[in-house]
């Protein structure tokens, strides 16, 4: 019984620490969205989408998942035009990009609390995410693998 009490107490302490980080971060992200910062990021990342073989419209999906969560990015993705040409290769590249960069502000703050430098974490996650997606896209283009259109 004592072990359950310790585990419960520890769980609440960890949850409290996460809420202290998550709630202010989400508020800041929402404020940045309201003042148009997300739109600036979308325009900034549009050329990157081209480099990764993705349509420009995907920059909104990328920015949303990077600043909030993969689920929010998928909601934005589901709102894209159904007639937008999209291949299985592009879906794979987008999925990999989201896996590397999702929830970046929250996770960087949590890593910083654990002793990891924020800049290093941002560089590693964004840099390796972009590099991995670039090479994955290059593989798909060179081999012609998974280039068939999919229906969103």
Please give the residue ranges for each predicted region:
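Alpha-helical transmembrane segments in multi-pass membrane proteins
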Residues: 21, 25, 29, 42, ...
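Structural signal for alpha-helical transmembrane segments and their membrane-water exit/capping regions
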Residues: 25-36, 135-143
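Membrane-core helix-loop-helix motifs of multi-pass transport proteins
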Residues: 85-140
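Hydrophobic alpha-helical segments of integral membrane proteins
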Residues: 4-15, 37-52, 114
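Alpha-helical transmembrane segments of polytopic integral membrane proteins
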Residues: 21, 25-28, 38, 73-77, ...
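Core transmembrane alpha-helical segments of multi-pass membrane transporters/permeases
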Residues: 10-32
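Membrane-interfacial helix-loop connectors
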Residues: 42-100
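Conserved small/polar residues in nucleotide/adenosyl-binding loops
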Residues: 150-152
């Amino acid at each position: 019984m004592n072990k359950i009490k310790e585990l419960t107490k520890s769980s609440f302490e960890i949850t409290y620490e996460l809420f202290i980080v998550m709630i202010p971060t989400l508020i800041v992200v929402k404020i940045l969205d309201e003042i148009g910062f997300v739109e600036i990021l979308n325009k900034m990342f549009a050329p990157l989408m081209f480099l990764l073989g993705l349509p420009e419209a995907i920059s909104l999906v990328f920015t949303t998942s990077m600043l909030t969560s993969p689920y929010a990015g998928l909601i934005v993705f589901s709102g894209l035009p159904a007639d937008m040409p999209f291949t299985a290769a592009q879906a794979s590249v987008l999925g990999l990009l989201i896996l590397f960069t999702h929830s970046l502000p929250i996770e960087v703050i949590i890593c910083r609390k654990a002793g990891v430098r924020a800049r290093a974490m941002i560089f590693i996650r964004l840099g390796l995410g972009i590099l991995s997606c670039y090479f994955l896209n290059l593989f798909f283009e060179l081999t012609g693998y998974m280039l068939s259109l999919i229906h969103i």
